[in-house]
């Protein structure tokens, strides 16, 4: 049967008290944005749920997009019918036959906001249930843990019937928790951290460091394409490319090998913080996981974080690598993340970086450099571009070459 509307139930919005209206409006805006390709759709956000009137739009396509909107707890496609027992019984039977398999159990859940309707909820449950038993063989009722739930809502204007309860991704609507920058590499961890930041309602902008000619255009395209995958969950994400080659060359030329990584990361964090301030962000996110590599030990974090008082949030800090990989596969970033295009974090990596760098040493070595000049020249060269869902930047040839490596 062709569904006529979708009933969307909110996630954590119920806990937000007086800010609830703002959160609902933001969610409605985000839903409208992901469904903008269907101009016939109407949106009606209300206190307890949102009604999406399909007006002929295919639910299968709408479903694919709603699954990626943060702030949705559950949703149900429904059919609007006239308020007669005959129509209710007929539609209920058609929906049940679409999903019922022998041995399945069911229950009917009726709600009635129109108390002038001729049948109350118990009467309607019994009448429709008896009709289904008469027309479907081997049908069994189960009140506690049924396989199928037929939901009937009697409203003032019509009756709405649904046979599915679909789960959204939960979380908070993107944009309700403020704005931040995300330090995005081309690896596995930072895209997962980005997804987790979006899930908490943070409006993130990607900061990506690239170092031509040491890194290729393919490496930059890979980072942009990762952003395109994540934009499925946000509608649009700004991508900020930061030239980093001069800083890396200077550090390699003038500082001891053991502190190359530490000082390099200090520069990255300072640049991310400057960009955050320029863009009106409140925090910095990254994909660091405690102890995973030399620059992510607690001692390294102390030596690197020293350059800012801005909150640095690490969503995957306590996750095992296997957990991060599983999430990357789930959200669709893993296959692209493992494509072997070198990023700026690997090209100048020393063979024996300090795992327990000293803060005073890091400060001392950094002070030998023209810190402000290097940072300003990098900022002068940044490029900002909006990236939209599934936007492509790697051509097929680049993908084929990467698969062969």
UniProtKB/Swiss-Prot annotation:
It catalyses: [ThiI sulfur-carrier protein]-S-sulfanyl-L-cysteine + a uridine in tRNA + 2 reduced [2Fe-2S]-[ferredoxin] + ATP + H(+) = [ThiI sulfur-carrier protein]-L-cysteine + a 4-thiouridine in tRNA + 2 oxidized [2Fe-2S]-[ferredoxin] + AMP + diphosphate; [ThiS sulfur-carrier protein]-C-terminal Gly-Gly-AMP + S-sulfanyl-L-cysteinyl-[cysteine desulfurase] + AH2 = [ThiS sulfur-carrier protein]-C-terminal-Gly-aminoethanethioate + L-cysteinyl-[cysteine desulfurase] + A + AMP + 2 H(+). InterPro entries: Rossmann-like_a/b/a_fold, ThiI_AANH, ThiI_fer, ThiI_N, THUMP_dom, THUMP_ThiI, tRNA_STrfase, tRNA_sulfurtransferase_ThiI. Residues 60-165 form the THUMP domain. Belongs to the ThiI family. Catalyzes the ATP-dependent transfer of a sulfur to tRNA to produce 4-thiouridine in position 8 of tRNAs, which functions as a near-UV photosensor. Also catalyzes the transfer of sulfur to the sulfur carrier protein ThiS, forming ThiS-thiocarboxylate. This is a step in the synthesis of thiazole, in the thiamine biosynthesis pathway. The sulfur is donated as persulfide by IscS. ATP binds at residues 183-184, 208-209, 265, 287, 296. It is found in: Cytoplasm. One of its GO terms (biological process) is thiamine diphosphate biosynthetic process. Its EC number is 2.8.1.4. This is Probable tRNA sulfurtransferase. One of its GO terms (molecular function) is tRNA binding. Pathway: Cofactor biosynthesis; thiamine diphosphate biosynthesis. It comes from Lactobacillus acidophilus (strain ATCC 700396 / NCK56 / N2 / NCFM). GO terms for cellular component: cytosol. HAMAP family: ThiI (MF_00021). Keywords: ATP-binding, Cytoplasm, Nucleotide-binding, RNA-binding, Thiamine biosynthesis, Transferase, tRNA-binding. Its main location: cytoplasm. CDD domains: PPase_ThiI, THUMP_ThiI.
């Amino acid at each position: 049967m062709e569904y006529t509307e979708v009933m969307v139930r909110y996630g954590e919005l119920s806990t937000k008290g007086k800010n609830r209206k703002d959160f609902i409006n933001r969610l409605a805006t985000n839903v409208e944005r992901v469904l903008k390709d269907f101009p016939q759709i109407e949106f009606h956000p209300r206190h307890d749920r949102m009604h999406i009137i399909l007006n002929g739009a295919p639910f299968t396509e709408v479903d694919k997009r709603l699954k990626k909107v943060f702030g949705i707890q559950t949703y149900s496609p429904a059919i609007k019918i006239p308020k007669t027992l005959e129509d209710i019984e007929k539609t209920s039977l058609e929906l049940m036959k679409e999903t019922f398999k022998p041995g399945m159990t069911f229950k009917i859940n009726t709600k009635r906001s129109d108390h002038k309707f001729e049948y109350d909820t118990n009467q309607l449950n019994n009448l429709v249930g008896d009709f289904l038993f008469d027309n479907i063989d081997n049908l069994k009722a189960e009140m506690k843990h049924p396989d199928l739930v037929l939901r009937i809502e009697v409203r003032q204007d019509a009756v709405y019937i649904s046979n599915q309860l679909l789960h959204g991704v939960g979380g908070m609507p993107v944009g309700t928790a403020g704005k931040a920058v995300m330090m995005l590499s081309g690896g596995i961890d930072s895209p997962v951290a980005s997804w987790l930041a979006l899930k908490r309602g943070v409006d993130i902008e990607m900061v990506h460091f690239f170092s031509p000619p040491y890194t290729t255009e393919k490496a930059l395209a890979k980072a942009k394409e990762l952003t395109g995958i994540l934009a499925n969950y946000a509608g649009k994400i700004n991508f900020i490319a930061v030239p980093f080659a001069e800083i890396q060359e200077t550090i390699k030329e003038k500082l001891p090998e053991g502190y190359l990584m530490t000082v390099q990361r200090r520069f990255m964090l300072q640049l991310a913080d400057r960009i955050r301030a320029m863009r009106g962000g409140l925090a910095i996110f990254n994909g660091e996981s405690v102890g995973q590599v030399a620059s992510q030990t607690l001692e390294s974090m102390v030596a690197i974080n020293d350059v800012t008082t801005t909150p640095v949030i690490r969503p995957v800090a306590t996750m095992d690598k296997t957990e991060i990989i599983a999430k990357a596969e789930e959200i669709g970033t893993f296959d692209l993340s493992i494509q072997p295009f070198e990023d700026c974090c690997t090209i100048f990596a020393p063979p024996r970086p300090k795992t327990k760098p000293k803060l005073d040493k890091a400060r001392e070595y950094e002070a030998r450099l023209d810190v402000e000049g290097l940072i300003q020249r990098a900022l002068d060269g940044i490029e900002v571009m909006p990236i939209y869902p599934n936007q492509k930047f790697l051509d097929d040839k680049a993908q084929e070459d990467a698969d062969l490596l």
